[in-house]
Design a protein with these regions (language model features):
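Conserved structural motif at the start of ABC-family nucleotide-binding domains
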Residues: 4, 19-21, 78
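The feature captures the beta-strand-to-loop junction immediately N-terminal to the Walker
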Residues: 35-37
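Helix-to-loop junction immediately C-terminal to a conserved catalytic motif
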Residues: 50
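Conserved ABC transporter NBD signature motif
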Residues: 58-69
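Conserved ABC ATPase "signature" region
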Residues: 66, 114-132
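ABC ATPase NBD coupling module
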Residues: 67-84
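Short coil-to-helix segment of the ABC ATPase nucleotide-binding domain corresponding to the Q-loop/switch region
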Residues: 95-105
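Conserved ABC ATPase signature
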Residues: 136-140, 144-145
Length: 153
């Protein structure tokens, strides 16, 4: 199943053309690395995929829903329920515990007490960090910190 399709995307900033008839297909479960020089358009590409920016022309299809028909409400729904975006800065409080950082994420704030602890434990298990709840973030490796950030989303 195709999760993300960009079809004939065009994007420019003034005279600078970032994308000309650019197309991309990403299947569900597929991992893709995006690399390029500074100013090449990597962030713009991710912003287009994340519905944070619109291309000048072309279409974006996410989980079967096709732009440009995305209303603001539909885009918000897709961003909340179908997309995850991990920034280069993980946004963790390094002097706090993993559990305290997890509680800052709104998806865990809805559950309280034992239910909240179980949701946090499940999310950490999914990223291979079972039992890390009481560890201080600054004691974790960069990769472990990244996995905590992934577990939060």
């Amino acid at each position: 199943m195709t999760a993300i399709t960009l079809s004939n995307i065009n994007k420019r900033f003034g005279e600078k053309v970032l994308f000309r008839d650019y197309s991309l297909h990403i299947e569900a479960g597929e991992f893709v690395a995006i690399k390029g020089e500074s100013g090449a358009g990597k962030t713009t590409l991710l912003n287009i995929i994340g519905l944070l920016e619109t291309p000048d022309s072309g279409s974006v299809t996410l989980c079967g829903a096709r732009s440009p028909s995305f209303s603001s409400r539909a885009a918000v729904h897709l961003r909340r329920h179908k997309l995850s975006y991990l920034f280069q800065n993980y946004g963790l409080v390094d002097t706090d515990t993993v559990e305290a950082n997890m509680k800052l994420a709104t998806r865990f704030g809805k559950a309280k007490g034992k239910a909240e602890k179980e949701r946090i434990a499940d999310a950490l298990a999914q990223v291979g960090l079972s039992g890390y709840e009481r560890r201080k973030v600054y004691t974790l490796s960069g990769g472990e910190q990244q996995r905590v950030a992934l577990a939060k989303i």
